[in-house]
Amino acid sequence: MNDQTPDRYVTFLGLDCDAKADRLMDMLAVRIQEDDSRWVGYFRQKLAEKERMATDNLHFVGSQINSLYSYFEELEDADALDLLWHLEHNCC
């Protein structure tokens, strides 16, 4: 295997998944403050559950991947969608 791409099935080292999940969660937090989409109530509920269960941001992203895609697609947020795609394919 001569490819220098990190292999997530061997190690998550070098992928910086936690920091990228944190960044996506920051993007989500900003968006739900600015928006009145039907998704806002959904994500507020899920974020409250996340706090009660004390799960990390990467776990939340992995658990909510389809909902996050739908929400960021609705907003046409290309940066969030790109980051979400990266997280899904490299970290989850």
Curated annotation (Swiss-Prot):
Keywords: Nitrogen fixation. It comes from the Bacteria. Signal peptide: none annotated. GO terms for biological process: nitrogen fixation. InterPro entries: CowN (IPR024899). Is required to sustain N(2)-dependent growth in the presence of low levels of carbon monoxide (CO). Probably acts by protecting the N(2) fixation ability of the nitrogenase complex, which is inactivated in the presence of CO. Belongs to the CowN family. This is N(2)-fixation sustaining protein CowN.
